[in-house]
Amino acid sequence: SQFYGYDLWNIYEFPFLLRGTPQLRMIQIKFPQDFPVIIESKSMKLYANSFYNKDFKKQDQVIQRLKSDLKTKMLTPDISFINKFENPSDNQIINHENIFKFEGFRSICPVTSQPDWATIYIYSKTNSLDRKFLNKFLLSFREQGDFHESCIIQIFNTILESLKSSSLNKKTHLEVVGKFLRRGGIDINPIRSTH
């Protein structure tokens, strides 16, 4: 199915040297949903930590280097230093009555076999979110070995098909957000939407 969205990566410990002085900054990387590869978080952690002894004259050079290293032939992710991460309260996230919030979502990392935990937010303009089905469906991921992005895409596609089959109007609006907890200094937050 066609969808829109992005994967928001927050790297909480990004070390480098700025004119010989050690720096430890936070970096945010926004990968478009159609980025041709899924980067494994352990690889990203090792890559980020490889900067600990690289010296730059200006901070902008760090961002330029990251963009150069991470771009593909067609796409370059948005990358920026940030001073603090936006952490919206539940009241900011849940401002619609048609939002289903599922805490304690669990899947298994296919590389390390470690659990990945998240809060999943599902929004639909229709009132046809079957909460009992959603609860059972999201619980079914508890032993599933898959990447964050793949889990959210599977959740999005399954719910979208369910909404389309239960609605006379085949144009339905759906958003699925996975706010995964940090592991190894990185959290990954996939977001998928019909538009």
Please provide the spans of the model-predicted regions.
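N-terminal intrinsically disordered, cationic/polar leader segments
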Residues: 1-195
